[in-house]
Amino acid sequence: MFKLNAQFTQGVQKFIYRHATRKLETENVVFLNYGYEEDPAMDVPLSASDEPDRYSIQLYHSTATQAELDGRRVLEVGCGHGGGASYLVRTLHPTSYTGLDLNPDGIEYCRRRHNLPGLEFTHGDAQNLPFTDQSFDAVINIESSHLYPQFSVFLTEVARVLRPGGHFLYADARSAQDVAGWKVALANAPLRMVSERGINVEVRRGMEKNLERWRYVIDRATPAILRGVIRRFAPAQRAYEDLRSGGAVEYRMYSFTKV
C-alpha cells in the first residue's frame, strides 16, 4: 500500500484517484483517510453534519492542532475531496486555506462541494508547488506523501513556501523497510522537528470505527458480484492488518517548524 515504484507513482495516482472521485462523488465521501481515535475517546465537538466523518476528522484535528492556525495562511498538500479543509476552516479559523491536489477531478469536486469564505482549491504537484516563497504560515499533509516519487523534493518545497517560524503539520505511514529512509529524509529537510509520535494504535482504532461506513461506500460503488472480493482485498483492509503491533507499516504524526 505504502510503496509504489517511483516511475509509475503519479500515473497510478492520476488513474486511481480520478476513478475514485467519479465513483464516490454521489456518496458524499469528502474524506479519504483511514481515521483516528484515542483511548479514552476524543471529545471533539462536531456538528450533526460532521458526525458521520468523526474518525477521519479526528486525524485532521490531531494533526492540525499541533500549531495555532487562527488568523494564519494555511496550505494543505494532498487535500483529496476537501473534507479536512472544510472542517479546519470552519473550526480553526485560518485567514486563508488553500487545498492542493494532483487529481483534477478531485479539485473540481472540492470547488463544487465546499464553498466557504477564505477557502480555495488548486490543481498542482506536491513536488513543484505553484506558490511564491514564504507564502504560508502552515503546511498540512495527511496520508498522502507516501505516493510522492521524490519525497525529499516535496520537503524542500514545503520549506520554500513556509515563512520563517511557519509550521509543517504532517501525518503519514511507510512500510517497515522504508521507515529508515523516511526518517533520514525528514532529518535532512530544511526544517526543525518539534514533535513526533507513532499512531498505529490510534489509526487502527479509527479504522475499526469507520468499518461500516467504508463497507457501505464499497457496496454502493462496486458491482454486487465483486463486493466480497473488493472488501477482502481493499487497500484499507490490508493497511488495517499491516498496522498491527510489529506489523509491516509504521504510521507517524509530526510537527516541524521552519527556522
Model-flagged regions — what are they?
Residues 1-31:
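N-terminal auxiliary segments of SAM/dcSAM-dependent transferases
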Residues 38, 53-70:
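Conserved alpha-helix/loop element of class I SAM-dependent methyltransferases that forms part
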Residues 201-259:
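Conserved Class I S-adenosyl-L-methionine
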Residues 127-139:
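A short acidic, Gly/Pro-enriched loop at the edge of an enzyme's catalytic core
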Residues 152-164:
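A short glycine-rich, Lys/Arg-flanked "PGG" loop and its adjoining helix->strand segment in the class I
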Residues 166-172:
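Conserved beta-strand signature within the Rossmann-like core of class I S-adenosyl-L-methionine
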Residues 75-77, 81-128:
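Class I SAM-dependent methyltransferase SAM/SAH-binding core
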Residues 138-150:
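A short SAM/SAH-binding and catalytic strip from SAM-dependent methyltransferases
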